[in-house]
Amino acid sequence: IVGGVEAVPGVWPYQAALFIIDMYFCGGSLI
């Protein structure tokens, strides 16, 4: 979901995720 609208697969190919000690905290797309 980008800006509250479902994104088309492949449109935002770069993603970031924050993991601390194997626990997922947050994620986002790099634009």
From Swiss-Prot:
Location (main, coarse): secreted
Cell membrane is among the record's keywords: no
Listed GO CC annotations: extracellular region
Molecular function per GO: serine-type endopeptidase activity
Keyword annotations from UniProtKB, A to Z: Hydrolase, Protease, Secreted, Serine protease
EC number: 3.4.21.1
A single BP term in Gene Ontology: proteolysis
Transmembrane among keywords: no
Domain Peptidase S1 residues, every copy: 1-31
Family that this chain belongs to: Belongs to the peptidase S1 family.
UniProt-recorded name of the protein: Chymotrypsin
The organism of origin for this protein: Penaeus monodon
Top-level taxonomy: Eukaryota, Metazoa, Ecdysozoa, Arthropoda, Crustacea
